[in-house]
Amino acid sequence: APLLGKEALVAVRTKILPCAHVVTPNIMEAEILSERSIRSMEDVKDAALRIHELGPTAVLIKGGHLTGQDAIDVLYDGQSFTELKSVRLDSQNTHGTGCTLSAAIAASLAKGHTLVSACHLAKSYVTEAIRNGFSIGQGYGALHHLWASGTFPDSIKPLS
């Protein structure tokens, strides 16, 4: 079942997106927002154009759900496209990647980085958080947000 009903989706398109600086939909979300299917990089770029027309300053479509040896995200800033590539990691420890990416972009922008630089930094950070992620509970495992510190707090260590 879709997370948002039709009325809520209309509100996202007409009220929220026009106020957004950067939106970061995954492939499935981008298909809904752009009202088109996405199967290729050209489709991703067309979807980014369509979403951009709804009002956000920039659109970063996350390519983690596409196939291929690389995970390629596409940033469109209203003028040009930038592809952000990383090696596709074979990991189930991906819970929270979208929220973490958005937060890392916002933090990098707040620190004064350009949009392109902020997106590159955020993608690198999330890639390493996935690479260093851990299985906890059932289902998708967690990212290791503190990977750069080299520490793993006892409070979040798996019990097994």
Regions found by a protein language model. Give the residues of each.
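Phosphate-handling active-site elements
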Residues: 81-82, 108-122
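Gly/Ser/Thr-rich beta-alpha loop segments that engage phosphate groups in nucleotides
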Residues: 65-66, 98-100, 104, 141-143
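Charged C-terminal helix
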Residues: 116-160
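Short pre-catalytic strand/loop immediately N-terminal to key active-site residues, enriched for Gly-Thr
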Residues: 81-95
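Glycine-rich beta-alpha junction loops
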Residues: 64-66, 87-90, 123-126
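Regular secondary-structure segments
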Residues: 76, 102, 106-110, 123, ...
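Conserved phosphate/ATP/ADP-binding segment of small-molecule kinases
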Residues: 2-81
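Short, small-residue alpha-helix embedded
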Residues: 32, 91-115
